[in-house]
Regions:
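Short, surface-exposed loop/turn motifs that are enriched in glycine and acidic residues
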Residues: 20-21, 57-61
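Short, conserved active-site entrance elements at the starts or edges of catalytic domains
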Residues: 29-53
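Acidic, low-complexity central loop/insert segments
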Residues: 1-37
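A short secondary-structure junction signal
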Residues: 5, 14-19, 41-44, 76, ...
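Glycine-rich, small/acidic residue-mixed loop/short-helix segments
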Residues: 46, 52-58, 66-68, 72-157
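Conserved active-site beta-strand-loop modules that form the wall/rim of enzyme catalytic pockets
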Residues: 4-5, 28, 40, 61-63, ...
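Proteins with a high burden of low-complexity, intrinsically disordered sequence enriched in S/T/G/P/A and R
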Residues: 1-4, 11, 41, 148-151, ...
């Protein structure tokens, strides 16, 4: 389980016993765990059910509570979201650059998604992407970006 906090304050020394990692390492771990981030996967247009966080953060069996009707509606319509957040893993050959955020995911020359976060990982990259719900996972897709570059990547839940 990935647990992390941001420490804000005047001290540059973290409390003893805390592991410190570079922002790039934290980003790689966040993406690998499939955790959406504000400004990348989450914004005012995001449908919460598309992010996959409902299974980890909402109880649909709890007794009566304020907002229960809204939660029940989210549960009954979650399969109706047009996209879902998926993890992407790809290999890069030689000196290849990481695909940028916004790169398209294509299956049989049809765009099925777009990368929202990308990080370097083990001779390749990991990413998160919103993909059309009709796409059967796991599968391989082509990651294509503006410079005419493309790489094959595995899409998984």
């Amino acid at each position: 389980r990935l647990v992390a906090v941001d420490l804000l304050g005047p001290s540059v020394d973290p409390p003893s016993g805390l592991a410190v990692s570079e922002e790039s390492e934290w980003e790689r771990r966040r993406i690998t765990a499939g955790i959406p981030a504000m400004g990348a996967e989450l914004d005012e247009r995001t449908i919460p059910a598309a992010t996959g966080v409902l299974d980890r953060s909402v109880s649909f069996t709890k007794g009566c509570y304020t907002g229960q009707e809204l939660v029940a509606r989210i549960d009954s319509r979650s399969a109706a979201t047009p996209t879902r957040l998926v993890r992407v893993k790809g290999r890069l050959e030689g000196e290849a650059q990481l695909p940028p955020v916004g790169s398209n995911l294509e299956l049989e020359d049809v765009q099925v998604g777009r990368l929202t976060s990308v990080a370097a990982a083990d001779s390749g990259f990991v990413a998160l992407a919103y993909v059309k719900r009709a796409v059967t996972l796991p599968c391989e897709a082509l990651v294509r970006w503006a410079e005419g570059r493309d790489e094959v990547a595995l899409l998984a839940d």
